[in-house]
A protein has these predicted regions:
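Short alpha-helices
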Residues: 97-130
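Internal catalytic-core helix/loop-beta-alpha segment
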Residues: 61-94
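Short glycine/serine/threonine-rich phosphate/pyrophosphate-binding segments
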Residues: 25-31, 88-95
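Short beta-strand segments
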Residues: 20, 46-47, 82-85, 97, ...
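A short, basic/flexible loop-to-alpha-helix module at the beginning of a structural domain
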Residues: 2-10
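Alpha-helical scaffold segments in soluble metabolic enzymes
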Residues: 31, 35, 69, 94, ...
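Glycine-rich, small/polar surface segments that engage phosphate groups of diverse ligands
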Residues: 10-74
Length: 130
């Protein structure tokens, strides 16, 4: 189930861990960010700052709400973790183009509720290994 992540050291050794998602995946991203932070990991949820998100959406377009934040905040010592049921959201795909290591936690079926539950389970399993 955790083939999405090689080992917990990838997260522990990152300067910052950026996390993002849309809709239900945004809630999972925020929850996972809290779990990482409580373990002493420098974690930032990219979908938590609505002022920055709406400024980027207004000035550049919603496809760039995550990638523009990463262009300003991130460097190659950081890690991006994305949650997406479809794996097709343009703003997620743009974020993955930013030149930092990343982990994609995407859905495997069209059952959104079941996939969102699976993503939260993965997040909890990762957190328990830190």
């Amino acid at each position: 189930m955790l083939k999405e992540i090689v080992n917990a050291n990838v997260i522990r050794n990152s300067r910052f861990v950026f996390v993002c998602g849309n809709g239900g995946s945004a809630a999972t991203a925020e929850h996972f960010t809290n779990d990482l932070f409580s373990k002493g990991i420098r974690a930032i949820c990219l979908n938590s700052n609505t002022s920055i998100m709406t400024m980027i959406a207004n000035d550049y377009g919603y496809d760039y709400v995550f990638s523009k934040q990463l262009e300003v905040l991130a460097d190659v010592r950081d890690l991006l973790i994305v949650f997406s049921v479809s794996g097709k959201s343009p703003n997620i795909l743009e974020a993955l183009k930013v030149n930092i290591p990343h982990i994609k936690i995407f859905g495997r079926s069209k059952n959104f509720g079941r996939e969102e539950d699976r993503h939260l389970k993965i997040a909890h399993q990762i957190s328990s290994r830190l």
